[in-house]
Amino acid sequence: MKNLIIPNDYHSKLDLHDTQIAIKTVKDFFQNQLAQHLHLTRVSAPLFVDPKSGLNDNLNGVERPVAFDIKEQDGRIAEVVQSLAQWKRYALKKYGFSYGEGIYTDMNAIRRDEDTDNIHSIFVDQWDWEKVIKLEERNLDTLRSVVRNVYRCLKNTEKFMSIQYDYIEEILPDDIYFVTTEELAQIFPDNTPKEREYYIAKAKGAACIMKIGDKLENGKPHDGRSPDYDDWQLNCDIVVYYPVLDIGLELSSMGIRVDKDALLSQLDKAGCPERAELPYQKSIIDGELPFTIGGGIGQSRICMFFLRKAHIGEVQSSLWPEEMVSECAGHQIQLL
């Protein structure tokens, strides 16, 4: 398959049984680190929401959410969440969280339009987190500070796993490198955005790529972002170099959330100003929700990275094209 990478001479250092134990080890340690360093409280989260609420993540604006009707409620439609980006900010207010406090949760989603490969699945599992900040903290200094805390959690987890498993060596650099999408475009003008991410990740080991969603000087955005959660001038992806596949691997997407001005501007740029009338978006415009920063951290990608797996299907159960399943089996890649 054209999207499948088969590493030379790959074989997993862990069998299926030990992989399951290792997955739990990674997840337990990392989420405890995240809660500790970002001062987060674990909460329960919805699997589905009312599409009329505006709480579902619109992602890049083209992905179709999974929806179903509810018999008892006269055929009312519910949508399976694509992420909890909007819901978390709403929950911080509803649950009464104050400045400096935050929440995290397990988020499970179905992305039916995903093109699957070694790192993409139609099943998405991530830690979604959000915390309250002040208006004056809506700046890049705040973003960088939180990114460093998240990166510290990643570094601590890698060190912990290297102690638990002899075959795992520490490969993350001591510090993460910060760069904007425009700076990347200037450094690598002849490359695609994904190629730029690969080159900077391979050169630096770990990169925080900032300002994603708006058009660059070349007239094209680095990548798509929903207009109604991240402020496109105050967001980022954490991308690390992954030698098993020789790729830049995105582990986290995060950002300072939109205020009224950023929301209205981005809705207009995205060609969907009518979304300003949805309940969630209207609550931002009316100043009813707290200022926040938040993000998502891929659980399966974290496990894949720290366990040095070749395919995300080695650490999560999903459905894959038959050709992919067959080719993986022929190269000692055991999909769950």
Residues covered by each model-derived region:
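Generic recognition of stable, solvent-exposed alpha-helical segments in well-folded globular domains
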Residues: I21-T25, F29, R138-S145, N149, ...
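Class II aminoacyl-tRNA synthetase-like tRNA-binding/catalytic domains
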Residues: K2-H120, D128-V132
